[in-house]
């Protein structure tokens, strides 16, 4: 029987402990934690797993230097703890340490002594060795495109980067490996009665608890339970631009624009990721446009600290879920809001990629789940990274790429290529992804379309527009 058909039948027949609505990083993290606690779980998403915010972030796992400036020391401390856990235990193949430079220009918003003090405090909270000021010559060795004109010095500190979509998928895989029903293209249709619309049919679901982790759609789901529910959040649009470059960078760049906003230049997947914008968004979360004005803003802000920016290869936009309130989105607190509706459905709004594990554990607490272990668990592929017996011959760059995306599960990805060497051909020109990854995405990772494969399960989309499998 087809795996998807089997999952739909199980959704209709099993009596569940928990239905998780939303397959972004928070929903996937909740499903992972709940299955580890022994719960019978179903995870559904109306689109694809990591189909929205969770594949459209700045790709950073970080303490949040700007949150220290806003006085949110608790959030910074918690985020740094989670960064270390993700790097060292949960997903060391996906979450990797990266130095960051914070340039100090003559006309910049901060004085060097202020930044140096902040970096020392930040690095102390991070338990990191890198902190303090470096001269222009060393900074230019780390970031060759750094604009030297007017540059007084750079602060140096440490954070981490990731592939956000694959981190989300690893959590989905962990939940599925423990028996969770996982279905993308499955939308919550009703709360009372509890029904899910999937493949043109409406399936009645029996679940003792429901958690709404629908990200930008969290209030839409709340209104299915209570049409009079007041808004719990607001949305902020973040646009990123991917350009050529970054392959010779040994550090990322944090560019201050005023005393609230920064933007980033991050060497990522062989490219350079620039961004992000932060503007209030009141449109349809299903279609978040990237305008020429958005792209121009990102490039202009990057040019404050970079010279010779390469050609644009891709753009994308995502939505941050922020607590409701007054004031600009850039200064809004990145906190998580939990609410419980009249039928007992718990809704989770907001949060950070870095702290998704903490949010998941807190959500289970709000659901009344007791005895949940807070000990971090390695995700699938996170162990045995130094003991991989590669089943086929590959160059070192391709091995490194697969090891990053899949960890030790790269062996599973490559196994069919033992009998079919054509699977070792490039998936698209100019990227290290292989045809074997396309097959694996469709047979093991719930990919239902070319976009699912190219955009969220591989890095093939970085080859440019018009790419098809």
Predicted regions and their residues:
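Glycine-rich Rossmann-fold phosphate-binding loop(s) that bind the pyrophosphate
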Residues: 23-24, 28, 46
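Helical element adjacent to the flavin cofactor pocket in flavoenzyme catalytic cores
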Residues: 155-194, 198-208
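Extreme N-terminal leader/targeting segments of oxidoreductases
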Residues: 1-18, 33-36
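Glycine-rich FAD pyrophosphate-binding loop
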Residues: 35-56
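C-terminal catalytic lobe of FAD-dependent flavoproteins
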Residues: 174, 230-243, 247-273, 279-401, ...
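Flavin (primarily FAD) binding-site architecture
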Residues: 212-227
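Short hydrophobic core segments
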Residues: 20-21, 205-215
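Dinucleotide-binding Rossmann-like beta1-alpha1 core, especially the glycine-rich loop
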Residues: 59-142
């Amino acid at each position: 029987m087809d795996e998807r058909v089997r999952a739909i039948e199980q959704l209709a027949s099993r009596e569940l402990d928990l239905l998780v609505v939303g397959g972004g990083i928070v929903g996937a993290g909740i499903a992972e934690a709940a299955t580890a606690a022994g719960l019978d779980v179903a995870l559904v998403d109306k689109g694809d797993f990591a189909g929205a915010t969770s594949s459209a972030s700045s790709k950073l796992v970080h303490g949040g230097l700007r949150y220290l400036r806003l006085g949110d020391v608790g959030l910074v401390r918690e985020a740094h703890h989670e960064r270390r856990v993700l790097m060292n235990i949960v997903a060391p193949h996906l979450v990797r340490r990266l130095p960051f430079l914070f340039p100090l220009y003559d006309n910049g918003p901060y004085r060097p002594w202020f930044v140096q003090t902040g970096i020392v405090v930040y690095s102390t909270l991070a338990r990191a060795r890198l902190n303090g000021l470096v001269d222009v010559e060393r900074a230019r060795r780390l970031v060759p495109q750094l604009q030297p004109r007017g540059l007084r010095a750079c602060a140096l500190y440490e954070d981490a980067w990731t592939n956000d979509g694959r981190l989300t998928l690893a959590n989905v895989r962990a939940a599925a490996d423990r028996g969770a029903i996982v279905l993308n293209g499955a939308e919550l249709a009703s709360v009372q009665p509890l029904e899910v619309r999937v493949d043109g049919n409406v399936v009645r679901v029996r679940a003792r608890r429901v958690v709404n982790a629908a990200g930008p759609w969290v209030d839409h789901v709340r209104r299915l339970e209570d049409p009079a529910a007041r808004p719990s959040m607001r949305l902020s649009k973040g646009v990123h631009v991917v350009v050529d470059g970054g392959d010779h960078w040994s550090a990322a760049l944090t560019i201050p624009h005023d005393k609230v906003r920064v933007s980033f230049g991050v060497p990522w997947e062989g490219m350079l990721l620039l961004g992000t914008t932060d503007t209030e968004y009141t449109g349809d979360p299903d279609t978040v446009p990237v305008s020429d004005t958005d792209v121009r803003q990102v490039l202009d802000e990057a040019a404050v600290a970079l010279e010779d920016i390469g050609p644009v290869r891709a753009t994308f936009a995502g939505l941050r879920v922020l607590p409701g309130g007054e004031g600009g989105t850039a200064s809004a607190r990145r906190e998580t809001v939990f609410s419980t509706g009249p039928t007992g459905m718990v809704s989770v709004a907001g949060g950070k990629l870095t702290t998704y594990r903490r949010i998941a554990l807190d959500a289970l607490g709000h659901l009344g789940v007791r005895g949940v272990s807070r000990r971090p668990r390695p995700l699938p592929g996170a162990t045995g990274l130094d003991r991989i017996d590669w089943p086929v011959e590959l160059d070192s760059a391709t091995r490194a790429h697969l090891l990053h995306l899949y960890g030790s599960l790269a062996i599973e990805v490559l196994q069919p290529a033992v009998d079919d060497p054509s699977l070792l051909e490039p998936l698209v020109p100019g990227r290290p992804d292989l045809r074997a990854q396309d097959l694996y995405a469709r047979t093991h990772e719930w990919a239902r379309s070319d976009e699912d494969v190219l955009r969220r399960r591989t890095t093939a989309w970085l080859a440019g527009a018009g790419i098809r499998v």
